Amino acid sequence: VHHGNGTQAIFWNDPNTLFVSTHQWPLYPGTGRETETGVANNVLNVPLPPGTDGVAYRAAVEAKVLPRLEAFAPELLLISAGFDAHVRDPLANFALVEEDFAWITARLVAIAERHGRGRIVSVLEGGYDLEGLSKSALAHVRVLAGA
C-alpha cells in the first residue's frame, strides 16, 4: 500500500525501464501522484483511495497496469511483493485478500511468459499482520511456482 518512492527515484531517468506502483493515496510517504510520470514517461503511478477492495483494485489493474505492461513488453519483471494491502493489515486501509494477490501474480506471470520467457524476480517488501502476510505470500508463491 505504500508508494515505491525509492524504486521510482532509481528508475526516474531510465527510459529502458517501466516502474509501476499501485498504492493507497494519501498515505506515507506522500509520493506517487498520477502526475509523477518519469523523465521518459516510464513511471506509472496508480493511487487508490483508502478502503480499496479487490473489485476496485482489479478494475484499476485491468484498466491501467496491464495494458501499460503489455505495451512495454518487459524482458524481465521485478516484483516488489508487499502484502500490507491485505484487509487484516494494521498499517493501512486496503481490503485485499490472498485471492487478489494470486490474481495479480497470475496476470504478471502471463505477461512475463509472453514477453520475457517467464523471467520474474519477486522480493518480499511488507505485510504487518502475520496471518494476512503468510496467506498472501503463500498464494503469491504458489502462482509463481505454477501450483
Which residues are covered by each model-predicted region?
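A general "terminal functional-core" signal
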Residues: 1-147
